[in-house]
Amino acid sequence: MILTMKLVHPLHHSLSSSIPFPSRKRQSKPYRCSLPSPGCEKVIRTETVLPPAPVSCEGRRVLLGCLLATASGILSTGSAEAVSTSRRALRASKLPESDFTTLPNGLKYYDIKVGNGAEAVKGSRVAVHYVAKWKGITFMTSRQGLGVGGGTPYGFDVGQSERGNVLKGLDLGVEGMRVGGQRLVIVPPELAYGKKGVQEIPPNATIELDIELLSIKQSPFGTPVKIVEG
């Protein structure tokens, strides 16, 4: 009687003893994904990549160290800039209203930092970062989200508040700023959410805006975010 024996490899091979196999790619069907821009679609093909040849533990440690060092260098620049901006805003928020400049329309502003770039005038297409606060509590901001420094700039044309496309206080507050500047604006109710209020903001509420002018462009820049509700 002849016995046939099969050799079964254990499931827990170490990385160093695994048998390398060449990478293979399996292409799947394309799918469509909607993009932020209206009416814009892009066909994206996905690929399923099977595991390549195993890498030794030592090699993985070296690679991981390099990746962490690179990521740390990239993130530190954006993070340092964001911290510097928020610190300036915090110091300015403690200033008395008497230090602010009052415009005829009731808007009050204080330039935390005066930029040295182009000036935003009516008709300029601008990109800004903003933080909107009510009684010191942030209720809306463009700084929160993805990206190295966090958030996505908000782009709009100065003067569009007349059409209801942008909050009046933000529109009027950015006018006269220069690229690279940061401004704290106290917005009266009539230039904010008026007698109706919006969500957690009550009627006749005065709000504050921390605005940083990033650039002035001739082409669209930033992601439009509706900050006028109702």
UniProtKB/Swiss-Prot annotation:
Keyword Aminoacyl-tRNA synthetase (UniProt): no
EC number(s) reported in the record: 5.2.1.8
Reaction catalysis annotation: [protein]-peptidylproline (omega=180) = [protein]-peptidylproline (omega=0)
Record keywords: Chloroplast, Isomerase, Plastid, Rotamase, Thylakoid, Transit peptide
InterPro entries tied to this protein: FKBP18-like, PPIase_dom_sf, PPIase_FKBP_dom
Transit peptide, residues from-to: 1-56
Record family assignment: Belongs to the FKBP-type PPIase family.
Protein name per UniProt: Peptidyl-prolyl cis-trans isomerase FKBP16-4, chloroplastic
Source organism per UniProt: Arabidopsis thaliana (Mouse-ear cress)
